[in-house]
Each structure stands twice: as C-alpha cells, then as structure tokens.
Amino acid sequence: DDDRSLLAWLDQLIRHGLSRLRNTPATEAFLPELIRRIGPIRATNFGELFTVRARLADEGDADSTAYTGLRLGQHTDLPTRETPPGFQFLHCLENTVAGGASRMTDGLTVVDELRRRHPADHEALTTLRWSFLNRAVDEEHRWSGPIIDHAADSDPLPLTLRAFYPVRAFPLMDPADQPRAYAALRRFSEVAHDDRFQLSSTFRPGDLVGFDNRRVLHGRDAFEPGAGTRVLQGCYLDHDDL
C-alpha cells in the first residue's frame, strides 16, 4: 500500500531488470491488484492471469512444460509474438516441493560476453532469423527474428532476446547459414546457463518476482510434482505501461 515502497521496487526493476518483494499476502487477489496500480495487464492466450502448477496428476497431459515438474532451461516468454511482453511477474502462493529453484540470467551480460569473446557467434545471433512457434490446444502463434534483436546495432538497449526451446525454433535462413546458426545457438545456451551469470533462489509463499522478459532469461530446476505443491500466479505488463 506504500507508494514509496512500490516506486523503489519498480525503480530496481527498470534499472536491473529484476526485483523481488518478500512477505506479500499469498492470495490470488494480491498480484492483479498490485499490477493494475501500475498499468493494464497484458493479456495473452493464457489469459490476463495464469497459474503455474504441475497438472499431470489431475488434468491429464499438460499442454506446456511449465505445467510439469521438468527442468526448464533459460528462456524468455512468448518470442512467438511480434512484441513479446515487456515484464513478467511471478507471485508464489504455495511451495512445499523439494527442488524447483528459480534461475535468472541477465541477458545484457550474456550479450556482452558473446560480443567480446565469441564475435562470430554474436554476429550470427544478431543477424540470422529464426521462426518461433507455439502450438497450444486450440491455437497457434508464430513470429520470426534473430535470437538477439537490437533496435539499433550500436545500442545495447532496447533489447529483445528471443530465447526459446530449440524444439520450437526453426531456422529461417539460407541452408548454407544453418550450421553456423546452430553453433551460435549452442554457444548462446552455454553462456546463458553459465553459473557465473545466474542467480538462483527458491520461492517462498509471499515472494513476488518481477523481471524484464526481453532482457532476463528465466528457468527452474526440476522437482517431483507428486511430492508437495508448487503454485505460482503470473501475469505480464508491457514496457510502455511502466
């Protein structure tokens, strides 16, 4: 309820791309009330709000790996859109599982490491285009672009990282360029999963994490969905609404 605390949290989110609140009310009403104080929630095919929990036990096969206990590699959400959501917020309502730690990687650091140490891979990642596809139960979304998408070649920001699971990304380029494109994608994954560039933490009920979805890659460790409960509520907000 304190505007100064909210401003400080949002200032950190803009500056660093990642910010956390602790000990917030672990209720379904809290997240939408808070985010709507900032701006309109960005609706997607998941709705305005979505709940991340393992569904295999009670709803049959999950239509997204997020709804399982599988490990999720570092990625950004919805590169299948012309403009992926600017910010993502995840609010922990319950967590009694072993494992499932959250992992965050600053994409600016990844891009800088690639530019300095692997310039050929960086060039391929910023120029060669991929097609990104997501097929849900009743709809499909597709967009194309480079993995590292700068608004201007000379500026680190604005930046859109289109980091997606390889099974949902397909080369949209001359076949002669595909070997170096896949080699660069493997290099990108190696750097994004380097422990030096990751922050790891375990969600506790009441934790609320906000991060820049076009800059920060997120993932999680595996957990056993039948041994406890892990429930996160999430939503998106566009950059120009903050």
Q: Which stretches of residues belong to each language-model region?
A:
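Active-site environment of non-heme Fe oxygenases that use a 2-His-1-carboxylate facial triad
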Residues: 1-18, 23-24, 28-242
